[in-house]
Swiss-Prot record:
Its main location: nucleus. The modification Phosphothreonine is found at T135. GO terms for biological process: abscisic acid-activated signaling pathway; positive regulation of DNA-templated transcription. The gene is ABF2. This is ABSCISIC ACID-INSENSITIVE 5-like protein 5.
Length: 416
């Protein structure tokens, strides 16, 4: 395999026999009737959130039953994975039922005018099928999800293909002619780690076209048929680069940097720092991307639009319901804990008040008993004093009288 590979300038290919969402042995090639009969559920009344969860469960069951393990060094044979890429559901569709979404798609197909939630590719498909109106049971899961605007992350599949093709002397091999000249705008810790781990040579410098990890690619690196049928204005214009010939592996590959969250690429690779082999620190500078082709975003609700609006790329609410519930439960726990502490404080305060009241009552009772005893003692003393005073008065009267007085007698009445 030639070391110089430009993922964006390769001739269009069939992608190993499968463009779009499906591959051989995929669940997405089943129709709704087949999927409902195999699962045993009615998906018409389910919302899109529950439909995706059922599809993921069926994927996991199929992967466990098949027992296929991805092999990095096995070429295209290692790509026969039963587990598909993750799906990104727009916020406007997460709570709609499957019947409602299908009615909207049917209306768009009959009128020929696309709504805000449908891409131009879905409009073209609906117009081509306007001659014969399909039912929901005849539509495959792939067609339904594409027309509804659900986005697939197939960049990781392309990354595995590149790893399988370059395993002989690529990212972690010992060949020295497999480096690529990567020129991007800001460093990422994953890029630094990959640059340290890789055995980078210094013989040749090859250009690597940087593409978003959310753009679906075929096995040979070409764009899918959906992207070939529609070209839009690029979100990021081409910028001049300085061409540092750094012998590095495909550090921008989604297999190395792991892709982003829910269809988003690693945005840290679009910053303003470049790396040079053998340098002990990063060299800041406005480094561009060599041979950058215009990025063609997939026209859907889940990925960027023509005006660069990426508000719909935010993750769906159902993916973070656990975090919201955790915050709510934490708040409730705090309120309950605060209430319990307040109740404990009130109980302790009431107990202290009762103890003070009881102690005060006991003290008052003791004081009353003491006062009663003192009163009785004083009354006894007063009685004794009164008796003594009475006796003294009687004795004083007797002493003052001194005995019986003599009576005056007339002994002689006269001289005669």
């Amino acid at each position: 395999m030639d070391g110089s590979m430009n993922l964006g300038n390769e001739p269009p290919g069939d992608g190993g026999g499968g463009g779009g969402l499906t591959r051989q042995g995929s669940i997405y090639s089943l129709t709704f009737d087949e999927f409902q009969s195999s699962v045993g559920k009615d998906f018409g009344s389910m919302n899109m959130d529950e439909l995706l969860k059922n599809i993921w469960s069926a994927e996991e069951t199929q992967a466990m039953a098949s027992g296929v393990v991805p092999v990095l060094g096995g070429g295209q044979e290692g790509l026969q994975l039963q587990r598909q890429g993750s799906l990104t559901l727009p916020r406007t569709l997460s709570q709609k039922t499957v019947d409602q979404v299908w009615k909207d798609l049917s209306k768009v197909g009959s009128s020929g005018v696309g709504g805000s939630n449908l891409s131009q590719v879905a409009q073209a498909q609906s117009q081509s099928q306007s001659q014969r109106q399909q039912t929901l049971g005849e539509v495959t899961l792939e067609e339904f999800l594409v027309r509804a605007g659900v986005v697939r992350e197939e960049a990781q599949v392309a990354a595995r293909a590149q790893i399988a093709e370059n395993n002989k002397g690529g990212y972690f091999g010992n060949d020295a002619n497999t480096g690529f000249s990567v020129e991007f705008q800001q460093p990422s810790p994953r890029v630094v780690a990959a640059g340290v781990m890789g055995n980078l040579g210094a013989e040749t410098a090859n250009s690597l076209q940087v593409q978003g990890s959310s753009l679906p690619l075929n096995v040979n690196g070409a764009r899918t048929t959906y992207q070939q049928s529609q070209q839009q204005q690029p979100i990021m214009p081409k910028q001049p680069g300085f061409g540092y010939g750094t012998q590095m592996g495909q550090l921008n590959s989604p297999g190395i940097r792991g892709g982003g969250l829910v269809g988003l690429g690693d945005q840290s690779l679009t910053n303003n720092v470049g790396f040079v082999q053998g340098a002990s620190a990063a060299i800041p500078g406005a480094l561009g991307v060599g041979a950058v082709s215009p990025v063609t975003p997939l026209s859907s609700e889940g990925i960027g639009k023509s005006n660069g609006d990426s508000s719909s790329l935010s993750p769906s609410p159902y993916m973070f319901n656990g975090g919201v519930r955790g915050r709510k439960s934490g708040t409730v726990e705090k309120v309950v804990e605060r209430r319990q502490r307040r109740m404990i404080k009130n109980r302790e305060s009431a107990a202290r008040s009762r103890a003070r009241k009881q102690a005060y009552t006991v003290e008052l009772e003791a004081e009353v008993a003491k006062l009663k005893e003192e009163n009785d003692e004083l009354q006894r003393k007063q009685a004794r004093i009164m008796e003594m005073q009475k006796n003294q008065e009687t004795e004083m009267r007797n002493l003052l009288q001194g005995g019986p007085k003599k009576k005056l007698r007339r002994t002689e009445s006269g001289p005669w």
